[in-house]
UniProtKB/Swiss-Prot annotation:
Entry keyword set: DNA-directed RNA polymerase, Nucleotidyltransferase, Transcription, Transferase, Viral transcription, Virion
Functional description taken from the UniProt entry: Catalytic component of the DNA-directed RNA polymerase (RNAP) that catalyzes the transcription in the cytoplasm of viral DNA into RNA using the four ribonucleoside triphosphates as substrates. Forms the polymerase active center together with RPB2. Part of the core element with the central large cleft, the clamp element that moves to open and close the cleft and the jaws that are thought to grab the incoming DNA template.
Gene Ontology MF terms: DNA binding; DNA-directed RNA polymerase activity
Record protein name field: DNA-directed RNA polymerase RPB1 homolog
GO BP: DNA-templated transcription; viral transcription
One Pfam family from the record: RNA_pol_Rpb1_4
GO CC term, one of those recorded: virion component
Subunit structure: Part of the viral DNA-directed RNA polymerase that consists of 8 polII-like subunits (RPB1, RPB2, RPB3, RPB5, RPB6, RPB7, RPB9, RPB10), a capping enzyme and a termination factor.
Organism of derivation: African swine fever virus (isolate Tick/South Africa/Pretoriuskop Pr4/1996) (ASFV)
UniProt keyword Transcription present: yes
Primary location recorded for the protein, binned into one broad class: virion
């Protein structure tokens, strides 16, 4: 009978009590001795019944040697009970809620029935139980005191009498608690409080605390420190009387009390970390013991941190052997190959089983042995099941079938290639090894175009390479991890690889028209030479004579014909910026490939560059597969490099030098900038700079200087006039996108300009008012603040060089500080989303809990998308009718078709206009990513079977229309199956929506007016191809889309921070780049957000186009507190008087004059009789009042309304220049009265509190709006003719701070278009669905053009809002989303605390996701392991055919 097997479905965590320990223990430890002679002492802590780690003796329990014995726990019977150190807080809770006399609950259990189970005991223990009377025995419950000096001691304070609660007494109290009480308080029966006090503790097996014996008998020996702790524990336990009885309130001998405390401390150190080697630590009472010069180790110390058991041993994967070396480039290698040094190949070994078909191939390895490469090192003999070293074999040793030969690595073996940090799944790829025979080479070599997978370069990067051993692992590696699988990026949906640098320039030069001196025109022989290293099928040159000339386009077309595609796009080479300064050949302005023939244009970055979405390699991959695209990249690269080697290409200093005339023109431009900067300085010195609302004079001055010192676009003119674009290598690299940019070219040739650090000029931080030692204090010239006039080629002065290095130093420090934050954020994202897996319905779920009804709302794989343009979106009604309405046949079907196209257009506009209105920067566009490029399929079908324009009858046209209509109707059945399509079962609404964008595109591209020259057979083929590609583009079952989303978002976010030093020297770095992502992913509340903003549209259309009116409204909503309007204030203790004689403070004697005038001008505002002796004197800032448009009258009225217990006097508003506006606020006696109307003593604290309230008083505006400025928006709207019009003259208000509700109450603000960046504020006002959309838009806004595919953003948003509340990606959010997945939360952080809480709650952890199965030693159910494979062994046996039987049949 065969034994069955089963997978672990769930794990339950419980508190282990005495009975559990006794049941699991195989022996009882009674003595502290380790050994008796050479054998373990019986009953000692090294008893052989607990296992063995020594080859001298076997385990008595299982009779196995040390390699096979897993170890067995023992027990130590305590003479006196001890508290379980992990559950001290739980013990305290139970003591607070149960009667110490009878064990009945003190609290009313019905009050806590509505709470979830884990919260009941916690809430009950937090209630007031001191002095309560027990419902059963009427005993008054005492006060439970936890000793502040001792972590383990509890005291009872009952009517002033304080008694110590020893563990034995606590155990007796807990033994009276009924199971019914335990369950009603939310705990499981398995978590009875009696288990929290132990009489028998478990001793761990010897295998986890091994000893190292350095000799036999009396020789030296060394043991694990934890054994010493156990020894002390046993010895101290023997000092306690066995029958010790402790009665509550009775004192025990001091020596016994100390021994009990020491035992408790030892048990704590045995389980948990020792926090200190001193007597106590910070008053916590956690004492520490010392083993030599270090704290004692513990069992729980092995779990947390990177080196702990969980992350290092259980979640981490270790390989037997691995190689690591520096990488360098080698263009002769394919993208899927890696050059491997021969010294490494002779060290790493590959295990290969000898079979009939490979014994002849393996025999040379066996004969070469270790002497010659390729050889082998060991042989595993199947008959004897033993391993033999190849050098120690006898002469008669034979290699037989079934043996395993450990041979050297040879060319053609597959290997894993990895670069850390592994932020994406493409960071581990499988390559084919090419052994480098040169013994001097010791580096890995790879194709330059392959670096994109690993984000690697050749500046000293090191990578890892290891070879899978078994046949199964080699096959799995090649199928699942081959680099061809990573060619299309999951993050951006575009190709990862392409031509870079030299090969990009070479492709451009080869395909140019009319190259100088005809360098890309060659004869037959030279053309054949270019193909020599492409490793493709050579094109046929038989039709060319030796005298025929071929240009570069013809040569490239010979290669492209092997994978015919159609391509049309403007190249990077053509730019409107360069057009005024250089002549473009008309044939190079647009690149067009027709059926594999390069008709016109050039190949540059946009066509063949790395990461070019929609480029040539992307199209080849979509039509012919990624393997063919990689071959084409290599072949094109070889063509380009071979051409560059022959024709020559270089960048020299001559390419960087300006002509004297151009240099003079550059200097004139720079002088103009410096003059403008000097004018701004003069305005500052004369006080003529008036900053707008929200900016200080200094900030506005710095902003003016930054704008004035920016290089204008016309600085390119002298550069372009001094170079020859046809021959200048530097310009050609920039213009083709191979390397560099316009700012780089300007910095090299013209000037560097203003250096910015954190978006600011260099600040005077060297000393007071000084930027560097080279400039005097308070210098205002632009050069003193980081403006560099010279270029790199001209050379920098000392201060200019220092300014440039300042930015580099800031970036390096910023990178170092951000690495840890982004790395941990990546890890939290991985753990937070890893349980999200696609099921058989293409839903995303966590175990059985739904996250997305359909992955990405359309069920598509992000790697299977193309960018297409929807032609109808930007057309007006009349244009749409002219272009798409078929009028050749009078039929209601074509009216229906046009009506459907118009509805599709309007629906598209409605959706994306709404998105535009509620996002800061996302504008409507007619370009979208879809799984099928219908226009390309139609073009390919027509080119492959050209029929010309043929007349078709009405029946054929109607038939084609019906075919398209039926196809669009049935397209959503792709998500279900063919059976449901045949039955025409109802389609769920969400599936119809998923296919809506694709159906719109099909109706546009297959409209009747566009398919007149297509036959019905061609139409059928087109629809079949569309369906096939659409089906292949669906996400696979079992895909771990959560991890894909985490990688796709975290990697560019991490790279955004780490690449700060790669930005332009004058671009600077914004240190707040990491703040906003942390706010989003941490789900911070509104009050904790540092960078929240609002965008407010105005209700009145006329005001919306008037910047002045918009600014007035912005002023009115900006929060102005009284404190912002004050220059200085004084709190005076003086008696009110209107004469100079009684003024206590002579410095303010002049106030009497305006106070007298105030009383004369305001006869109704005479001082009251109850004025106290406290006065608040304030001087107002007239400049701020003018800028904020606030009058003195409005300030006074606001203060009087909010503070009636004061008497306010003020000077006139229109004072002379230099004379401030003064307000005196006298406190009245009522401000110093209690609610009982009794007079309080005059107190300075009360007066200070009144001052604080006055300063924080709101004068005007909406709370939360710190600043408000007018910004110009670009938005779309549909006019009366149905045309989409772009509006550029709309003004809106952008605020710093958020308060949606307050903004909705303002009559000038349109409440329907309020946009806030705050997720919390949006959630509070609009609900969870609005918060979900806000998460998506905020991540997209933060990441900008580096953002990933929106499906990954949807994954984040749906997971964070799945519970109905916005949960963070932090530990707290994971606890809320997956409270039952204890193993996952334990793997993330704080494993000891997570395990403790799980045991208290008796948590049941179902095994799902990735971390939990991995920790349990099983295979996660994802990817190819998601689907179960059922094999009929009986059928295979019955139908098995041997080679001989097949030959007989033939």
């Amino acid at each position: 009978m065969e034994a069955g097997y089963a997978e672990i479905a769930a794990v339950q965590f419980n508190i282990a009590g005495d009975n559990d320990h006794k049941r699991q223990g195989v022996m009882e430890v009674t003595i502290s001795n380790l050994f008796e002679g050479t054998l373990p002492a019986e009953g000692g802590i090294y008893d052989a019944r607990m296992g063995t780690t020594d080859h001298h003796y076997k385990c008595i329990t299982c009779s196995h040697q040390r390699k096979q014995c897993m170890g067995h726990p023992g027990i130590l019977q305590m003479h006196a009970p001890v508290l379980q150190p992990l559950f001290i807080a739980e013990i305290r809770r139970w003591l607070r809620v149960i009667c110490l006399n009878c064990g009945a609950p003190i609290v009313d259990l019905k009050r806590y029935e509505h709470l979830i189970r884990p919260k009941r005991l916690i809430e009950a223990a937090s209630s007031q139980t001191e002095g309560k009377q027990c419902y059963v025995c009427k005993t008054v419950h005492p006060k439970i005191i936890k000793d502040s000096e001792d972590y383990f001691t509890f005291w009872v304070d009952q009517q002033g009498k304080i008694d110590k609660l020893y563990p034995q007494i606590i155990r007796e109290i807990f033994s009276r608690v009924t199971y019914d009480t335990v369950v009603k308080l939310g705990r499981s029966k398995n978590s009875h409080p009696e288990k929290l006090v132990l009489k028998a503790i478990q001793i761990p097996p010897i295998s986890i605390r091994p000893g190292i014996r350095l000799g036999i008998g009396s020789g030296p020996q060394s043991f694990h420190d934890i054994n010493n702790v156990i020894q002390y524990l046993v010895r101290k336990n023997l000092l306690i009387p066995k029958d010790l009885q402790i009665v509550r309130g009775q004192k025990i001998p001091l020596n016994i009390d100390r021994n009990l405390q020491t035992i408790q401390q030892l048990y704590y150190n045995f389980l948990l970390d020792s926090v200190s080697t001193t007597a106590t630590q910070g008053g916590t009472g956690k004492r520490g013991i010392v083993m030599g010069a270090r704290p004692a180790p513990s069992i729980m110390r092995r779990l947390p941190r990177k080196e702990g058991r969980i992350r290092k041993s259980l979640l981490g994967s270790q390989v037997w052997s691995i190689s690591r070396s520096t990488i360098c480039g080698n263009s002769d290698l394919h993208l899927d190959e890696v050059g491997y040094p021969i010294s490494f190949a002779r060290t790493l070994q590959v295990a290969e089983t000898v079979q009939h078909y490979n014994i002849n191939r393996l025999m040379p390895y066996f004969l070469n042995g270790k002497r010659q490469y390729p050889g082998c090192s060991r042989v595993y003999k199947q008959i004897t099941q033993s391993v033999h070293d190849i050098e120690g074999l006898k002469q008669d040793f034979r290699l037989e079938v079934g043996d395993i030969l450990y041979r050297d690595v040879v060319t053609g073996d597959v290997a894993f290639f990895n670069r850390q940090p592994s932020l994406e799944r493409s960071s581990i790829g499988v390559h084919r090894i090419v052994v480098l025979e040169n013994p001097k080479i010791s580096t890995f070599q790879m194709n330059v175009s392959a670096c994109a997978w690993y984000n690697a370069d050749f500046d000293g990067d090191q990578m890892n390479l290891w070879v899978p051993w078994s046949v199964m692992s080699r096959v799995e590696a090649e199928l699942l991890c081959s680099v061809r699988n990573w060619f299309i990026s999951t993050k951006s949906s575009g190709p990862v690889n392409g031509q870079v640098q030299d090969s990009t320039v070479g492709s451009f030069l080869l395909t140019r028209t009319n190259t100088p001196m005809g360098k890309n025109v060659m004869n037959k022989l030279h053309a054949m030479g270019l193909f020599q290293t492409t490793q493709t099928d050579p094109p046929c040159f038989a039709n060319y004579s030796p005298t025929d000339l071929l240009d570069g386009k013809s040569v490239v077309s010979m290669l492209l014909r092997q994978t015919p595609i159609n391509y049309q796009r403007a190249p990077t080479w053509y730019s409107e910026v360069y057009a005024p300064y250089m002549h473009y050949n008309k044939q190079d302005i647009s690149t067009q490939i027709r059926n594999g023939e390069l008709i016109e244009g050039v190949l540059d970055k946009k066509a063949v560059g790395a990461g070019s979405s929609g480029g040539i390699y992307h199209l080849i991959s979509r039509r012919y597969g990624p393997q063919q695209a990689l071959k084409m990249i290599f072949a094109t690269q070889q063509l380009a490099l071979n051409y560059v080697r022959n024709a020559g290409f270089t960048v020299s200093t001559a390419d960087m030098l300006l002509t004297p005339e151009a240099h003079q023109e550059v200097q004139e431009i720079i002088n103009e900038l410096l003059l403008e900067s000097e004018e701004i300085n003069n305005r500052l010195l004369h006080g003529d700079i008036m900053p707008p609302i929200g900016l200080t004079t200094h900030d506005f001055y710095e902003k003016l200087q930054l704008n004035a010192l920016k290089f204008p676009d016309r600085i390119l003119k002298p550069i372009m006039n001094s170079i020859n674009p046809e021959t200048n290598g530097l310009f050609q690299m920039v213009a083709t996108g191979a390397k560099g940019s316009n700012p780089n070219m300007i910095h090299i040739m013209a000037g560097i300009g203003q250096i910015e650090i954190n978006t600011q000029r260099i600040q005077p931080q060297f000393s007071f008012g000084r930027t560097l030692v080279y400039y005097p204090r308070f210098a205002l010239e632009a050069q003193a603040y980081g403006f560099i006039c010279n270029s790199y080629i001209a050379g920098l002065t000392s201060p200019e060089f220092i300014f440039g290095e300042m930015n580099g130093r800031f970036d390096l420090i910023n990178k170092a500080l951000s690495t840890s934050s982004t790395g941990y954020a990546n890890r939290k994202a991985i753990f937070g989303l890893q349980s999200c897996i696609v099921d058989y319905y293409r839903r995303v779920s966590i175990d059985t809990r739904l996250v997305q009804q359909l992955y990405g709302e359309d069920g598509l794989d992000a790697r299977q998308l193309e960018t297409v343009r929807f032609e109808t979106i930007m057309l007006s009604d009349q244009e749409l009718e002219d272009k798409f309405k078929y009028t050749g046949i009078q039929s209601p079907l074509f009216e229906e078709e046009f009506s459907r196209l118009k509805k599709d257009r309007d629906k598209y506009r409605q959706i994306f206009l709404n998105i535009e209105n509620f996002n800061f920067s996302q504008l409507l566009t007619d370009v979208r990513q879809v799984p099928v490029n219908v226009a390309s399929i139609v073009k390919n079908i027509l080119l492959s079977s050209a029929t010309g324009v043929l007349p078709f009858d009405e029946k054929t046209i109607l038939q084609k229309y019906t075919m398209v209509k039926t196809f669009c109707k049935n397209l959503p059945y792709v998500f279900i199956n063919n059976i449901q399509e045949r039955l025409q079962t109802p389609i769920p609404v969400y599936l119809k929506r998923a296919a809506s964008l694709m159906r719109m595109l099909i109706r546009i591209e297959l409209a009747t007016v566009k398919t007149l020259n297509i036959t019905c057979e061609q139409m059928s083929a087109i629809l079949d191809l569309i369906r096939l590609q659409y089906t292949q583009s669906l996400i696979n079952y079992g895909e771990a889309v959560g991890i894909l989303a985490a990688q796709s978002v975290s990697e560019p976010l991490t790279q955004y921070m780490l690449d700060s030093h790669h930005r332009s020297v004058a671009g600077g770095t914004n240190k707040s780049g990491i703040v906003r992502p942390q706010e989003i992913f941490s789900a911070k509340p509104v009050e904790a957000e540092q960078s929240s903003e609002m965008l407010l549209r105005l209700k009145n259309p006329e005001v919306e186009t008037n910047k002045t009116y918009a600014q007035e409204i912005a002023n009115s909503i900006e929060l102005i507190t009284f404190e912002r309007l004050i220059l200085q204030w004084h709190l005076l203790y003086e008696t009110y008087s209107s004469t100079k004689k009684n003024v206590m403070y002579p410095d303010f004697a002049s106030d009497v004059e305006w106070m007298t005038d105030f009383l004369e001008n305001h006869p109704l505002l005479q001082p009251p009789e109850d004025i106290a002796n406290w006065c608040i004197r304030l001087e107002l800032n007239k400049t701020t009042m003018i800028l904020k448009s606030i009058s003195l009258e409005s300030i006074i009225n606001s203060l009087r309304a909010k503070h009636p217990n004061t008497y306010i006097m003020h000077s006139v508003e229109n004072t002379a220049s230099g004379i401030p506006i003064i307000i005196r606020i006298y406190l009245r006696e009522s401000a110093f009265r209690r609610s009982t109307n009794t007079r309080m003593a005059t107190d300075e604290k009360i007066a200070v509190n009144v001052v604080d309230k006055l300063l924080n008083s709101t004068i005007r505006g909406i709370p939360g709006i710190k600043n408000a400025n007018v910004v110009k928006l670009m938005r779309h709207r549909v006019d009366a003719q149905g045309k989409l019009v772009r509006l550029d003259n709309i003004y809106a208000i952008k605020t710093n701070g958020t308060n949606i509700f307050g903004a909705m109450l303002d009559d000038n603000i349109d409440p329907y278009t309020i946009v806030s960046s705050s997720i919390g504020d949006t959630m509070e006002l609009y609900g969870i669905e609005a918060a979900r959309q806000k998460i998506i838009s905020e991540i997209r806004t933060v990441m900008g053009d580096k953002g990933p595919n929106h499906r990954h953003l949807l994954m984040y948003a749906d997971l964070m809002t799945r519970t109905g509340q916005v949960t963070s990606l932090e530990k707290a959010g994971l606890n809320a989303r997956e409270p039952s997945n204890v193993l996952l939360r334990m793997a993330l952080s704080s494993p000891v605390q997570v395990l403790t809480d799980a045991a208290v709650d008796s948590a049941v952890n179902p095994i799902y996701g990735i971390a939990a199965p991995t920790l349990m030693g099983s295979v996660p159910r994802i990817g190819t392991m998601y689907s179960d494979i059922i094999m009929d062994e009986k059928y295979i046996t019955e139908n098995y055919k041997s080679v001989d039987s097949m030959i007989d049949m033939l």
